[in-house]
């Protein structure tokens, strides 16, 4: 058996032996250990470059620099014992460095902007800061505005708004008695119950419920009333969290199934055995049809709670659909827990006329008490003829001619019976009459010569309300179009009036082409847009502030963009910056 001796090596392994003497010594020791004869085969290989230890470590530029700096001597003496002694003792002299030309110091000039002496460090509120402009960039000086005195017709226009709550309900006496008896019957018996109120839009459902609840709360102070508009809820399951926050008012840790936790907490609260532990609860869910889902489990749960034996929950649902319980909730009839149904029919022409006249007379009484225009006369200056004139005018309908009210009521009753539309027409007619009066006279109104809206004003207001959206947008003013452009830029459906005013002010001050309105002027312009059925203003709570009302567009966004297409000032509202 022939073994390859260690001396026989391949070209790749030959580099492992640094010294030839070490290679011969290793071969001799192997031959002495093995007594059998051996021979070696020499294979021609490529001769490798001979590298000396000193040159291999000091000929490269990098390591030469290390040697010059004196660092290599300390690093290599421990690794290589045979390091030359001369290199340990002697150091090469440092190479002379090229002298550098000294740099001339540059001259720096510091520019300091002078500070204004009138600058104060007091914090400015954000709403005030929006309406302030930079002095050196102001394109036009703000014109000082004279405080405007509220007109005599402002009370009348306020009474014709949709959010106005009158002292009594006109034209719904039968429905009011049914709702009052329902509440009193269940509150006296300490039992739960369910009521479903249906009817077309503008038939007085929400107004009547608010009026009845005010009397119920005054007669039963311990009752807890919870009113929720379901249009403010993103998904049907979120109704449990909304009710829990208003009734139980206890915090629950949120997790993936936090809606189920709120539901279980409410169910245990409404169905506990000891009825004395909690007061009766009345829950009013306006726009209840927004809770309709695929399986309707949320609605079934809500209507099942009042039917429990120990429940003291009174549930009232309000929606437009007349047959919502029969079409979407058929299992309620199977379980014999069908709620009490109450349907509101559309208003007749006589009812609409009666409601408008009652509101205008109430507004006239309020205006006479707070009227700043009526001059105070002494008793000697008042004649018998003036007393007869005052008594004669007291019997007439103020602000609008009775024939004009009848015309408006008949037109609305023939089309839809929506009271809100009739109120908008009458308010717009008063604005038209007031505008004509100010154009012809010295821009003042007096209680002696109040311009009553005539039939011509009602006809013009009706035609303006019945126009297409594009035609109505075309006739708007610059500030009205600016507010609509702001709504399009916001790209959200649930914004309050305060949020839209903040965005509107920032857009006007960004381009400095339109001077923004004040907060009160902004609300007036928004109310005029609501009169033209271009936007919708609705309150989130019963006693909400005007700035907290939710504002939304009733016309397509493309119609707004088309209406402002030829106005370059408003086009910049859509620029992204």
UniProtKB/Swiss-Prot annotation:
Keywords: ATP-binding, Cell cycle, Cell division, DNA replication, Mitosis, Nucleotide-binding, Ubl conjugation. PANTHER family: CELL DIVISION CONTROL PROTEIN 6 HOMOLOG, CELL DIVISION CONTROL PROTEIN 6-RELATED. It holds the Pfam family Cdc6_C. One of its GO terms (molecular function) is DNA replication origin binding. Belongs to the CDC6/cdc18 family. Part of the checkpoint control that prevents mitosis from occurring until S phase is completed. Plays a key role in coupling S phase to start and mitosis. Acts at the initiation of DNA replication and plays a major role in controlling the onset of S-phase. Together with orc1, involved in the maintenance of replication forks and activation of cds1-dependent S-phase checkpoint. Together with orc2, plays a role in preventing DNA rereplication and resulting genetic instability. The keyword ATP-binding applies. InterPro entries: AAA+_ATPase (IPR003593), AAA_16 (IPR041664), AAA_lid_10 (IPR041083), Cdc6/18 (IPR016314), Cdc6_C (IPR015163), ORC1/CDC6 (IPR050311), P-loop_NTPase (IPR027417), WH-like_DNA-bd_sf (IPR036388). Residues 37-57 have a biased composition (Polar residues). This is Cell division control protein 18.
